[in-house]
Every structure is written in C-alpha cells, then in structure tokens.
Amino acid sequence: MNWESEWFRIELIRGSRRISNFFWAFILLSGALGFLSVGLSSYFGKDLISFLSYEQIVFIPQGIVMCFYGIAGSAFSLYLWGTIFWNIGSGYNKFDKGKGIVCIYRWGFPGKNRRIRIEFSMKDIEAIGMEVQEGFYPRRTLRLKIKGQQDVPLTYIGENLTLREIEEEAAELARFLQISIEGF
C-alpha cells in the first residue's frame, strides 16, 4: 500500500507476517513435537501420543537422534514464531520533497537497535537501481544508488513481484524523485 501526494510519498513494507511464514512455522513445530514425543516415548518405554508408536525405535541411537531433531526443530520454529510476532522487516520508505529527505524505517529484533532508521538527503540519490535475476529462484529488487555509500534496498527480498510490477514501481518512484533508472 502506497500513499503519494505532490511533495510526499510513503511506501509501506510488509514484514514477516506472511501466510507462508505462518504455514512453515506451524508445520515445523508439528513435526518437531512429533519427533520429540517419539524419542521420549522410546526412552520411557510407553506411548506418550497414542498414534505415534515407539516400538520400532530403540532409544540408543534412534531415540536420541529423534529427540535431537525434535529439539532443533522446536528451536527453529520458535525463531520463526518470534519473527512473526515481532514482524521483523516491516516498516516504510518515506520520501519528503519539502524537507529534501528520504527515510527508510524497518523493525528489527528486540534490543538496543530494534528500530532501524536510515535518513539521507535527496540530493545524494544518483538513481533507482533495478536488479532482475530470472531462473529457478527469481530475484527482483529495487535499490537507491547513493553517492559515496552502498546501495539501499527498497523492496523486501522475499517479495515475489512480477517483472511488470517491479518496473511500474521503479517508474513511479523515478518519476516522483525525478531521477533515472539503472539496471544491475
């Protein structure tokens, strides 16, 4: 969702609260708890969950390995649920012609640097960079080329924009900032 006037433009960036992240976090947690319960069932010698039988699993070495996979999967699932809860990567791009500044704002992990804010002058922007890589895992990103600094990404890496959408977004932004578009 974007908002634009003659002197002001805001682009909202969607973070990690995506349907795919919810799906994978749930699947990973379910599988990890299944592995952990079968591993613990083989240790205790009784079924902790009735439909997951432990009888074919000897605790050493299969039960230990299943417990390890269950703990590792639970930890990774907890990480995914944390990124969803804190909405890591969400934020906005603000372009203000009146003040002549660009502000890139993102939410990070909790701590001292949770709020990530990059601010620079519009005079320092050289061009809009558009990177397009086709193939099995296509990558399409927009970047701001800034004098004397590294490029600043404007789009989320996991965002699956079509070539037409990324071109339209680049053209709108270039028209608003009155600068050129370059390819990488």
Swiss-Prot record:
GO terms for cellular component: chloroplast thylakoid membrane; photosystem I. Its main location: plastid. It comes from Anthoceros angustus. Keywords: Chloroplast, Membrane, Photosynthesis, Plastid, Thylakoid, Transmembrane, Transmembrane helix. It is a multi-pass membrane protein. It is found in: Plastid, Chloroplast thylakoid membrane. Belongs to the Ycf4 family. NCBIfam families: PRK02542.1. The gene is ycf4. The chain crosses the membrane at residues 21-43, 58-80. One of its GO terms (biological process) is photosynthesis. This is Photosystem I assembly protein Ycf4. Pfam families: Ycf4 (PF02392). Seems to be required for the assembly of the photosystem I complex.
